[in-house]
Amino acid sequence: LPLLALGLAALICVATGAFTSVSAVRAAEVNVVGDSNALLTLTPYNGPNGAYFVDGNGDGAYELALSSDHRGINVNATIVLHDVFTITNNGTQQVRVTITGIGDHTNNISFGSLDTGMTLGVGQSVTVSVRIDTHGLTDGDRILDSIIISAEA
């Protein structure tokens, strides 16, 4: 009986003890799918400015190509391209979509309302326009290295 009482006392102490953190290992599976099956689809807009949003290498990595020789655009200019590409929410819930530029001159490019975010319902699309301001830049400056398109439920 004293041994049983000691065992219960130890069990109670363990069961009521506090802890500050817990760690657990879980398995996760992430599959890459083609754009037609993705939760967000990017497509060139079906209009004249959609021609600037190109998959030059055929690898699904789109680029904004403003000249056929990829030399760039003039300095001290402002270029606005309406309706360049479309983002479609193919998921099962609404998401807030934002575009963030990565590079040295991200303040010189804007993606309209997607700079601060826009909510897309299931099946909804948004057409993205691009504004580029090269004032203050010099010949050879690279405006962006890449963009991140984020979707948060």
Where are these regions (language model features)?
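Intrinsic-disorder/low-complexity, polar/charged segments enriched in Ser/Thr/Lys/Arg/Asp/Glu/Gln
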Residues: V25-A27, V80-V84, S125-T127
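Short acidic, flexible loop segments centered on an aromatic residue
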Residues: V33-D35, T92-N107
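Short beta-strand and strand-turn-strand segments in soluble, beta-rich domains
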Residues: H105-D115
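Buried hydrophobic-core signal for structured, non-transmembrane domains
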Residues: A18, D83-I87, D145-I149
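Beta-strand-rich interaction surfaces with strong enrichment in secreted/lumenal proteins
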Residues: G72-I73, L114-L120
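Beta-sheet-dominated interaction scaffolds and their linkers
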Residues: D35-N90
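Short, polar/proline-rich extracytoplasmic segments that appear immediately after membrane translocation
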Residues: L1-G56
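C-terminal, structured domain-capping segment
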Residues: N90-T92, G121-A153
